[in-house]
Amino acid sequence: MTTPSIKLNSGYDMPLVGFGLWKVNKETCADQIYHAIKAGYRLFDGACDYGNEVEAGKGVARAIQEGIVKREELFIVSKLWNSFHDGDRVEPICRKQLADWGLDYFDLFIVHFPIALKYVDPAVRYPPGWLSENNKLEFSNASIQETWTAMESLVDKKLARSIGVSNFSAQLLMDLLRYARIRPATLQIEHHPYLTQERLVTYAQKEGIAVTAYSSFGPLSFVELDLKDAHETPKLFDHDVIKGIAQKHGRTPAQVLLRWATQRNIAVIPKSNDPTRLAQNLDVTGWDLEASEIEAISALNRNLRFNDPLAIPVV
């Protein structure tokens, strides 16, 4: 099964549905990637901070070696972590991440957060997380402009075909677009019916920046992180609005939530290690929700953000 794609402003096509690597266990990651490729997934969304890029690369290599897929048919995404925002740190860490994946280039390399932290030597701790080598929250003075200029050089050197940002507000995008020589191809944000961010999505798309949603199932991704809001918020899978629409279309609640995004040209990156759910999550483009159903789902908005750096105890 293949999915439609979004034409990026860089000229490349990005699949509308991909497989996210956040919280994918290192022990099972290689197999999960391999089986996802067999199921038809072509976009894989990784990051330094996820700590599983070596294993993900092994899954990709196995699929390529067995002739299931060619490298050029895959769309591999990774992210620049906060500790490497200084201009002279961007290229070295990108090269390390490429080596971890066993790749020559990333299809898309993203600034993970608009937060610059003090450099942590990968030889000391990797992934570095939020704390410095002194186990304190320490910031770098690197500006977004300094970081973005270094990101642009990755495209010049063919280490990344496209570059993008994540967790940026509209105001930060406005600032970035004033000086960007290479415009961000994508914006990845937390996006689900409890956090619709409609104005941000509209602005980004108007500027020709493709939007990718993470945590499409809302609190589900954050319950195991023991976040109070996630525990106290009704699960979207159990919400009467979502369940009713799913029943009407003969789909699962997960498929409805994903289609709510993809029908508005927002890419999604769910994950699963269940073969049935893998196939179901990929089947979220060949059928449509009614306009009234999209509106009903969007009306569930609470402006409730789960992935909030200010919620981290050390901040």
Curated annotation (Swiss-Prot):
An example GO BP is: D-xylose catabolic process
Q: Which UniProt keywords apply?
A: Carbohydrate metabolism, NAD, NADP, Oxidoreductase, Xylose metabolism
| Keyword ATP-binding listed | no
InterPro entries linked to this entry? AKR, AKR2D, Aldo/ket_reductase_CS, NADP_OxRdtase_dom, NADP_OxRdtase_dom_sf
> What Pfam families does UniProt report for this protein, alphabetically?
Aldo_ket_red
Where is the catalytic site? 50
Top EC group: oxidoreductase
Q: Which GO terms describe its cellular component?
A: cytosol
**Residues that hold NAD(+) according to the record:** 166-167, 215-224, 271-281
Pathway stated in the Swiss-Prot or TrEMBL entry: Carbohydrate metabolism; D-xylose degradation
Q: Where is this site: Lowers pKa of active site Tyr?
A: 79
Q: What is its EC number?
A: 1.1.1.307
Origin superkingdom: Eukaryota
Q: Which reaction does it catalyse?
A: xylitol + NAD(+) = D-xylose + NADH + H(+); xylitol + NADP(+) = D-xylose + NADPH + H(+)
Q: Which GO terms describe its molecular function?
A: aldose reductase (NADPH) activity; D-xylose reductase (NADPH) activity
**Binding site residues for substrate:** 112
- Report the function annotation for this chain: Catalyzes the initial reaction in the xylose utilization pathway by reducing D-xylose into xylitol. Xylose is a major component of hemicelluloses such as xylan. Most fungi utilize D-xylose via three enzymatic reactions, xylose reductase (XR), xylitol dehydrogenase (XDH), and xylulokinase, to form xylulose 5-phosphate, which enters pentose phosphate pathway.
UniProt record similarity statement? Belongs to the aldo/keto reductase family.
Q: What is this protein called?
A: Probable NAD(P)H-dependent D-xylose reductase xyl1
